[in-house]
Design a protein with these regions (language model features):
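Short, structured patches in soluble enzyme cores that scaffold and shape functional sites
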Residues: 144-147, 154-156
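Nucleotide/phosphate-binding catalytic cleft detector across ATP-hydrolyzing
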Residues: 1-37, 48-142, 159-166, 170-279
């Protein structure tokens, strides 16, 4: 049965946002760690036995591009820093972590980073599948719009039957904004986050392209729901654009969608790797 969006998912996402780079919530063992290596950010999240977030570390970082870790040393350094912070905050030691990868890319890319940071892998799966598993969907589509790619998964009778990845995401939003305003890419990234409503007319065509990509992948699949996830979905205007493009489908976009994939990864470790938790 699908998790209830308002009673189960939204409170967990809201809690993750409140905990981000802050003091952890009170918790008891066992605890599970998930690490999301994104194009624009690295997020490490710890959840408890109920799948509730208890600690979250986030760094905006340019270490992954289009599913490829181009700054391996930088990625390992960030993961080690997150690990040290979480262990100090929670008073425990993490030996295992779950992670994910964009569909169609090599999972060893993420695995190598975590292993180089001193962690063993408790579970690894592609990003939209992680979200689909978290939501416990049936006959639905999941669209994970991250920094560098848009991942699509089709779920039938509780199982992921199709997944794909397209090289369009938040990074391309920043490129469009940088060109429009005549500014550097790093400045565009910061401007995007602080002037989200203002930039919508400029970046809307990129999201329209994303919606057309999604339409191509879900055509004929017979899904009855469409879920959006990923940090790039937090741009005001995205939900309404997808609702207009897919009028026959309920389109779900929970608040704080930036944390959906990290929450899904951490929960995948909890559900698939019982016993591989903090000590």
């Amino acid at each position: 049965m699908a998790h209830d969006e308002q009673r189960w998912l939204s409170p967990r996402l809201q809690k993750a946002a409140a905990l981000c780079n802050q003091a952890p919530a009170a918790s008891e063992s066992p605890l599970w760690l998930g690490i999301d290596l994104g194009t624009c950010d690295v997020v490490s999240m710890v959840v408890d036995r109920d799948g509730q977030p208890v600690a979250v570390c986030l760094d905006w970082a340019d270490v992954v591009r289009d599913g490829i870790v181009w700054d391996f040393f930088g990625a390992v350094t960030l993961v080690r820093r997150h690990l040290a912070t979480l262990e100090q905050q929670l008073g425990c030691r993490f030996t295992h972590a779950a992670t994910s990868f964009p569909p169609g890319t090599d999972p060893r890319i993420s695995i190598n980073v975590l292993e180089s940071a001193g962690l063993e892998i408790s579970h690894v799966l592609d990003e939209p599948t992680a979200v689909a598993d978290l939501l416990q969907l049936d006959n639905a589509g999941v669209v994970d719009i991250g920094g560098g790619t848009t991942g699509i998964a089709i779920v039938k009778q509780g199982r992921v039957t199709y997944s794909a990845d397209e090289a369009t995401g938040g990074h391309h939003i920043s490129l469009t904004l940088a060109g429009n305003r005549g500014i550097g890419l790093e400045e565009a990234e910061q401007y995007k986050r602080s002037h989200a409503r203002e930039i919508w007319p400029v970046v809307k065509p990129v999201y329209e392209k994303m919606a057309e990509i999604v339409a191509r992948h879900i055509a004929g699949q017979g899904i009855v729901d469409l879920w959006l996830a990923g940090g790039a979905c937090m741009q005001p205007g995205v939900h309404e654009l997808f609702r207009q493009r897919f009028p026959a489908l309920p389109v779900h976009l929970p608040q704080y969608s930036l944390f959906m994939t990290p929450l899904a990864i951490a929960n995948s470790g909890r559900e698939k790797a019982e016993g591989m938790y903090a000590s």
